[in-house]
């Protein structure tokens, strides 16, 4: 079934409650997550846009385990991380645009400060919309999507080593990342996840992406 905007928001609220409960149960693990830092010139800066209401340094469902998996997959590289500064909220109508602007500003500023640094962009759920917009793929009309307000400059596209997307809402519209970044993108949509699959009917599938982070890290490592 295809969700209306209202139904989709109710779904995400239910998922948010589940995510918070998982965060409480797995609090010890979340506390061990890497501290977010992008101040120094690491070889690779991992920029993460978390999901709606997702707790954790980078996000307990995807961001934190993804950063750890990337560290394991890139033992010869130094890595830093940056959590996109945005509400990740259903009650804020410009949440995605705020994240879109912050992600682009961060990459632009960081690239100027660290000329040899490369970037891996990670987006989960609403955060995937943030990443989509930032590379010029509009999430407007998708669940918790919005219009593009900023894009990564074309002069920096070669610095984007990989894009890792999880539960990307534009996929429920039949859209995907195409063009310049297509070959550098690994886009995971769990079977029956209603956020990214128009006929999906398993809300818990949207919480399953921690199991894909090792494969995503291998994909990204081959492109750094």
Regions found by a protein language model. Give the residues of each.
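Active-site catalytic motif of lipid deacylating hydrolases and related acyltransferases
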Residues: 40-118, 190-213, 217-223
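A generic structural signal for short, non-catalytic loop/turn and secondary-structure boundary residues
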Residues: 31, 77, 180-181
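C-terminal region of N-terminal signal peptides and the immediate post-cleavage residues
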Residues: 23-42, 142
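Hydrophobic alpha-helical membrane segments, chiefly transmembrane helices and signal peptide h-regions
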Residues: 22-29, 124, 129-130, 213, ...
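Serine-dependent carboxylesterase/thioesterase catalytic core
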Residues: 100-182, 195
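Short amphipathic
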Residues: 185-186
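N-terminal export and membrane-targeting signals
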Residues: 1-21, 30-32
């Amino acid at each position: 079934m295809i969700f209306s905007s209202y139904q989709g928001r109710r779904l995400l609220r239910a998922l948010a409650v589940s995510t918070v409960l998982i965060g409480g149960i797995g609090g010890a693990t979340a506390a061990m997550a890497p501290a977010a830092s992008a101040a120094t010139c690491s070889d690779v800066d991992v920029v993460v846009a978390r999901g709606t209401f997702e707790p954790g340094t980078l996000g307990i469902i995807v961001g934190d385990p993804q950063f750890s998996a990337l560290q394991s997959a890139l033992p010869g590289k130094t890595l830093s991380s940056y959590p996109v500064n945005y509400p990740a909220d259903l009650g804020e109508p410009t949440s995605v645009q705020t994240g879109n602007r912050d992600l682009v500003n961060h990459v632009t500023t960081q690239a100027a400060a660290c000329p040899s640094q490369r970037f891996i962009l990670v987006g989960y759920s609403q955060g995937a919309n943030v990443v989509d917009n930032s590379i010029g793929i509009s999430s407007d009309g998708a669940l918790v999507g919005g219009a593009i307000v900023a894009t990564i400059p074309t002069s920096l596209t070669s610095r984007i080593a990989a894009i890792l997307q999880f539960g990307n809402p534009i996929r429920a519209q039949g859209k995907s990342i195409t063009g310049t970044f297509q070959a550098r993108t690994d886009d995971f949509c769990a079977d029956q996840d209603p956020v990214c699959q128009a006929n999906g009917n398993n809300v818990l599938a949207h919480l399953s992406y921690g199991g894909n982070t090792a494969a995503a890290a291998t994909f990204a490592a081959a492109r750094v």
